Curated annotation (Swiss-Prot):
Known role: Mitochondrial protein that probably regulates the biogenesis and the activity of mitochondria. Stimulates cardiolipin biosynthesis, binds cardiolipin-enriched membranes where it recruits and stabilizes some proteins including prohibitin and may therefore act in the organization of functional microdomains in mitochondrial membranes. Through regulation of the mitochondrial function may play a role into several biological processes including cell migration, cell proliferation, T-cell activation, calcium homeostasis and cellular response to stress.
N6-succinyllysine modifications at: K145
Cellular localisation: Cell membrane; Mitochondrion; Mitochondrion inner membrane; Mitochondrion intermembrane space
UniProt xrefs under Pfam families: Band_7, Band_7_C
Name the UniProt record assigns to this protein: Stomatin-like protein 2, mitochondrial
Subunit annotation: Forms homooligomers. Interacts with MFN2; may form heterooligomers with this mediator of mitochondrial fusion. Interacts with PHB1 and PHB2; stabilizes and recruits them to cardiolipin-enriched mitochondrial membranes. Interacts with CACNA2D2.
Membrane-related topology note: Peripheral membrane protein; Lipid-anchor
Species, as recorded: Bos taurus
InterPro entries found in the cross-reference section: Band7/mec-2_domain (IPR050710), Band_7 (IPR001107), Band_7/SPFH_dom_sf (IPR036013), STML2-like_C (IPR032435), Stomatin_HflK_fam (IPR001972)
Positions bearing Phosphotyrosine: Y124
Cellular component GO terms, alphabetical: actin cytoskeleton; immunological synapse; membrane raft; mitochondrial inner membrane; mitochondrial intermembrane space; mitochondrion; plasma membrane
Family in the record: Belongs to the band 7/mec-2 family.
SMART domains: PHB (SM00244)
GO molecular function: cardiolipin binding; T cell receptor binding
Length: 356
């Protein structure tokens, strides 16, 4: 009988502990788990136990045994991350603009003892602290900075909450601003400001585009002129090189002709052949003078071909008086010998010209 009674009592205690753990933890005394001697604490929860009205210990997750009548579960704290909606409130910025702003608060209980005995309602206390801190931080910023520095504002609110909530055993993980509502007039002025800023930006971009276009056109003209001047320079250099090559080639050809002529003059009857050539060229050049309509100078007796030939021979004779030093003796020795034959041949040539 005693064994059956013990088993029945154990079953009742186990059933009571399971029912207590299934209920949601609340601060009201009616919602707290009862002391059934054997208790099972759920994961991520901390049960604060008082013995005879004083703090005794904190029950960890798992199996726990309490003394009936003496021990009492006074608080149940959740160690999970808690999400709290901060109600919408009004705040005044540094430039005297009234805003309606709300947010979301993420916190976690780090010390169940401080959360139980440090403050009456930790969640409500943190919510009120978040609202007051948010109003204080918004008063330090202008309206433009509130929108631009939203992340830094959230970080400042988190730091301020953690400094004040440390004695409550609560840590604020993050704070996020949800909505910021501005007055209608301020909203209209902000729209006008945005439109003006856009027009200004469009004007600046258009002017920059015009400037860049002008710079590109000028740069293109500059490059074109540089390339044209370089091309002209290269053309002049090539033309000069071609002319120099032509002059050099002509000079070489003339020098070769002179060398061949000099070599021919040193041969037998070279003077006679040279005299005949000079006479022919003189007569030919004189006969071409009448073909041009230019003012010319005629000899004193243009009808006398003999005098013309004699004059040409005189010119050649004057040229042959200053021969090359090496060939001077040979030319002078042959000149006396060939004069008669040269004169005779010239006379015959002149007679044929007269008869024709």
């Amino acid at each position: 009988m005693l064994a059956r009674a013990a088993r029945g009592t154990g079953a009742l205690l186990l059933k009571g502990s399971v029912q207590a753990s299934a209920r949601a933890p609340r601060r009201a005394s009616s919602g707290l788990p009862r002391n059934t001697v054997v208790l099972f604490v759920p994961q991520q929860e901390a049960w604060v136990v008082e013995r005879m009205g004083r703090f005794h210990r904190i029950l960890e997750p798992g199996l726990n045994i309490l003394i009936p009548v003496l021990d009492r579960i006074r608080y149940v704290q959740s160690l999970k991350e808690i999400v709290i909606n901060v109600p919408e409130q009004s705040a005044v910025t540094l430039d005297n603009v009234t805003l309606q702003i709300d947010g979301v608060l993420y916190l976690r209980i780090m010390d169940p003892y401080k959360a139980s005995y440090g403050v009456e309602d930790p969640e409500y206390a943190v919510t009120q602290l978040a609202q007051t801190t948010m109003r204080s931080e918004l008063g330090k910023l202008s309206l433009d900075k509130v929108f631009r520095e939203r992340e830094s504002l959230n970080a400042s609110i988190v730091d301020a909450i953690n400094q004040a909530a440390d004695c409550w055993g609560i840590r604020c993980l993050r704070y996020e601003i949800k909505d910021i509502h501005v007055p209608p007039r301020v909203k209209e002025s902000m729209k006008m400001q945005v439109e003006a800023e856009r027009r200004k930006r469009a004007t600046v971009l258009e002017s920059e585009g015009t400037r860049e276009s002008a710079i590109n056109v000028a740069e293109g003209k500059k490059q074109a002129q540089i390339l044209a001047s370089e091309a002209e320079k290269a053309e002049q250099i090539n033309q000069a090189a071609g002319e120099a090559s032509a002059v050099l080639a002509k000079a070489k050809a003339k020098a070769e002709a002179i060398r061949i002529l000099a070599a021919a003059l040193t041969q037998h009857n070279g003077d006679a052949a040279a005299s005949l050539t000079v006479a022919e060229q003189y007569v030919s050049a004189f006969s071409k003078l009448a073909k041009d309509s230019n003012t010319i100078l005629l000899p004193s007796n243009p009808g006398d071909v003999t005098s013309m030939v004699a004059q040409a021979m005189g010119v050649y004779g004057a040229l042959t008086k200053a021969p090359i030093p090496e060939a001077q003796d040979s030319v002078s020795s042959r000149s006396s010998r060939d004069v008669r034959s040269t004169d005779a041949s010239l006379d015959e040539e002149l007679d044929r010209v007269k008869l024709s």
